[in-house]
């Protein structure tokens, strides 16, 4: 009898508060019917206790769209026997973690789109150099509160049912859940409000997309898009169920506008990479084609790689044989982004932007990244560098050249952030390349190898001719005269 007291008390409270314990009639609310399981009566018991223990959390749920529509705690947290993280709590079998599998009971389309995305795969970094830096050069505690909070941890359940505190709490976008699913919806739709408005605001992305190696948030803020957003952020109708650019709002785009949200001719998507034609992450950028398999797994193939045909059985990168459902070329991916751009910009302006963007990426690739990468590879082959990562100064210099400075330049160009494209970008790339990378190559390689490498990969390019040839007397005089006229005589 004692167990049902909270149920009776909370039922009365909810009736007074006017919130439904079970889903209301769909036709009366002008919406599609909720699944039959929604509005489980067990949820009232949860609310009764947690209203006293975690009132703010319950208040957030009450204010959420799910709370208003009658979807309650037990609907999302219910577990089944055999679930790795299931445990009995006050007579109910529940799980703390709500995984994409759980969300998919109502939001299957969104989960299907997310399933093969780069977001879902963000936790698969165990073999990467970034992870080596975190785990070995830094240490596991730094990884737990740093890398994994964005990329996602592999949640481990200890004997007795508790989570390993080295892996939990965690809401990283690529979290590996106990039920085997990848991802965390709450990374963007923070519990327990689950707000579409919050997920559409740039700040939701800014938790992870910022800093010296991926400064999308900083680039966005200095761009015209970010300036417009700050000026008119309260006029974007972000809480609407549908959010179509040019229809529901016109004032300013957010990250979601370009990468996820609907246009009059294109549906919304939870695959944030679907409209991206370049990869700006590796040392050398390449355009990417996308292969979609019948199990909704996706993978990128660099431009120039032979593409499979629809219906063909191929071995994917993870070793599994899958049937090809669709192939998107990098041009088709770009067309999807161009469709978004055209909602606000004329065709000539969009074409000009992409021309400038492409040229910057090619400048970075050809003038700095390819020569530096080729030199590093030759030094490894000549055994001038050990195969152990990051044990020599030159490896750190090269790493930051592409991973920090090179990314900043490319991201700056991709989102119209001039300061990041130049001063935080190509300027820093050039400074590191000429004043650190080349001198360190000379020291590591020794002669005659250093001269051979630099002549082959660097000085043979017209863009590097100034390093050896310097400037003419006339060019120097022209610069000096400019500064004299602008700033006066300088002592």
Language-model segments: residues:
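Positively charged n-region of N-terminal signal peptides that target proteins for export
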Residues: 1-4
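C-terminal segment of classical bacterial N-terminal signal peptides
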Residues: 14-25
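Internal gly/pro-rich beta-alpha loop/helix module
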Residues: 77
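Short N-terminal segments immediately surrounding and downstream of signal-peptide cleavage
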Residues: 26-49, 404
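Extracellular glycan/ECM-engagement signal in secreted proteins
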Residues: 148
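Primarily the internal scaffold of c-type cytochrome electron-transfer domains
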Residues: 29-33, 56-71, 82-144, 153-490
């Amino acid at each position: 009898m004692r167990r049902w007291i909270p149920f009776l008390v909370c039922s009365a409270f909810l009736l007074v508060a006017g919130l439904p314990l079970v889903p209301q009639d769909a036709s009366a609310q002008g919406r599609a019917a909720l699944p039959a399981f929604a509005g489980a009566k067990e949820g009232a018991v949860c609310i009764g206790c947690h209203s006293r223990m975690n009132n703010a959390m319950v208040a957030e749920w009450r204010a959420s769209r799910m709370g208003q529509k009658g979807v309650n705690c037990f609907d999302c947290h219910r577990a089944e026997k055999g679930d790795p993280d299931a445990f009995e709590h006050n007579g109910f079998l529940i799980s703390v973690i709500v995984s994409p599998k759980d969300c998919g009971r109502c939001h299957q389309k969104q989960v299907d789109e997310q399933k093969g995305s780069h977001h879902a795969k963000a936790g698969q970094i165990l073999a990467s150099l970034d992870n080596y830096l975190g785990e070995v050069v830094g240490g596991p505690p730094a990884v737990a509160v740093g890398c994994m909070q964005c990329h996602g941890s592999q949640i481990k359940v200890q004997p007795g049912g508790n989570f390993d505190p080295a892996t939990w709490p965690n809401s990283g976008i690529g979290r590996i859940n106990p039920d085997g699913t990848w991802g965390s919806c709450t990374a963007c739709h923070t519990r327990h409000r689950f707000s579409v408005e919050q997920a559409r605001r740039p700040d939701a992305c800014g938790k992870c997309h910022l800093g010296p190696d991926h400064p999308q948030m900083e680039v966005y803020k200095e761009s015209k898009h970010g300036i417009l957003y700050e000026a008119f952020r309260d006029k974007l109708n972000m809480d609407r169920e549908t959010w179509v650019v040019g229809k529901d709002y016109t004032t300013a785009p957010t990250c979601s506008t370009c990468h996820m949200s609907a246009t009059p001719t294109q549906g919304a998507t939870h695959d944030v990479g679907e409209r991206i034609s370049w990869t700006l992450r590796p040392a050398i950028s390449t355009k990417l084609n996308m292969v979609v398999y019948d199990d909704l797994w996706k993978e990128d193939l660099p431009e120039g790689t032979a593409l499979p045909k629809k219906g063909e059985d191929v071995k994917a990168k993870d070793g599994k044989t899958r049937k090809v459902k669709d192939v998107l070329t990098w041009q088709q991916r770009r067309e999807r982004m161009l469709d978004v751009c055209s909602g606000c910009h004329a065709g000539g302006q969009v074409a000009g932007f992409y021309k400038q963007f492409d040229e910057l990426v090619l400048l970075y690739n050809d003038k700095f990244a390819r020569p530096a990468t080729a030199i590093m590879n030759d030094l490894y082959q000549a055994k001038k560098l050990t195969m152990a990562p990051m044990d020599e100064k030159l490896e750190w210099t090269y790493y930051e050249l592409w991973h920090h400075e090179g990314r900043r330049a490319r991201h700056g160009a991709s989102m119209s952030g001039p300061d990041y494209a130049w001063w935080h970008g190509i300027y820093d790339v050039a400074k590191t390349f000429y004043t650190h990378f080349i001198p360190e190559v000379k020291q590591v390689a020794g002669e005659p190898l250093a001269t051979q490498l630099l002549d082959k990969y660097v000085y043979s390019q017209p863009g590097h001719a100034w390093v050896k040839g310097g400037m003419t007397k006339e060019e120097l005089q022209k610069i000096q005269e400019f500064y004299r006229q602008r700033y006066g005589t300088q002592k």
